[in-house]
Structure formats: C-alpha cells, structure tokens
C-alpha cells in the first residue's frame, strides 16, 4: 500500500514588504533560504511576520537578514528565549552573494527583503538589489498609479 502524503496547510506568501516597492527601484531579485529555529517556523505557519524595515547586510562573506520581525506564538516554549528581531542567516550560492556584495558597495544601492513565502516545505526569502527613489520619483509613481486606477474606472463605466 502506498502512503498518502499529507499536504501542508500553509501555502503561498507569508509576508510582503510593500513599503520597499514604494521607496526603491527594484533592479534584480534573488531567492534565498533562511536559517530558522523551531518557534520561528511555527510562527510563520500562522503568518506572524513583518518585513517593513527588513534589509540584508553582509558580514564575513555571509548574508544576514536584519529588521525582520517574527512574532512568537503565545504557546511558545518557556525554556527557549524567543527574540523576534534577531538577525537571521540567508542561504545564497556564492555567485549570488558576490553579486550582492559587488552592487551594495556602490553608492545609493542596497539589498532589501521583499517577501517571505513557502516553496514546498521550505521557507524562502525574496531579496532584491534596489536603488533609493527620490521624492519626485515617489510622486510620479503615485500619479501613474492614480491615473491607471482612473483609466480602469472610466473603461469600466463606458463599457
């Protein structure tokens, strides 16, 4: 008899960093694994994560996710210290890591966390090489978004 595989109840996106799309121009994206502890995985299954000010730093040729908040569950173990804002190691291959190091050394460039999501039974983090937007760039983006919204409304109303 064959065993029936139990499907995971957690699927898709865990957390998005919408603020990063507003504040930065996205140049290139990478998919990275995360080194997590047990309580963090349980919290992520419940969707208790925030990436609002999350970014990537390079320390001793290793990538670290800084500023990501994973809130512990109320039922978390009492003998394990749960630190919601700790730095988490990112798992990238050598070429991706060298590319991130090379680009982030340039002025105005940084690496930001864009999303946390499930891929199979693994948790992945989408990191992107980004360039900061100026204030007028943000206004242009908002103006374009408003115009496309109005355009859709007009097309829907006329049809």
From Swiss-Prot:
Any single GO BP term: trans-translation
Keyword flag Cytoplasm: yes
Disulfide links within the chain: none
Compartment(s) where it occurs, according to its Swiss-Prot or TrEMBL record: Cytoplasm
GO cellular component: cytosol
Principal place of residence: cytoplasm
InterPro entries: SmpB, SsrA-bd_prot, SsrA-bd_prot_CS
Protein name in the entry: SsrA-binding protein
Organism: Marinomonas sp. (strain MWYL1)
């Amino acid at each position: 008899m064959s065993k029936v595989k139990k499907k995971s109840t957690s699927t898709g996106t865990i957390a998005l960093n919408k603020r990063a799309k507003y504040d930065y121009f996205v140049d290139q994206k990478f998919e990275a694994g995360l080194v997590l502890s047990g309580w963090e995985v349980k919290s992520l299954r419940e969707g208790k994560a925030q990436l609002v000010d999350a970014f990537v730093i390079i320390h001793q040729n290793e990538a670290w996710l800084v500023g990501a908040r994973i809130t512990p569950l109320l039922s978390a173990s009492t003998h394990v210290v749960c630190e919601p804002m700790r730095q988490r190691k990112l798992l990238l291959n050598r070429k991706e890591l060298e590319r991130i190091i090379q680009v982030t050394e340039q002025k105005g460039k940084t690496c930001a966390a864009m999303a946390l999501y499930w891929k199979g039974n693994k948790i992945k983090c989408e990191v992107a090489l980004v360039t900061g937007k100026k204030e007028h760039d943000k206004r242009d983006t908002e103006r374009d978004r408003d115009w496309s919204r109005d355009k859709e409304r007009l097309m829907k109303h006329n049809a």
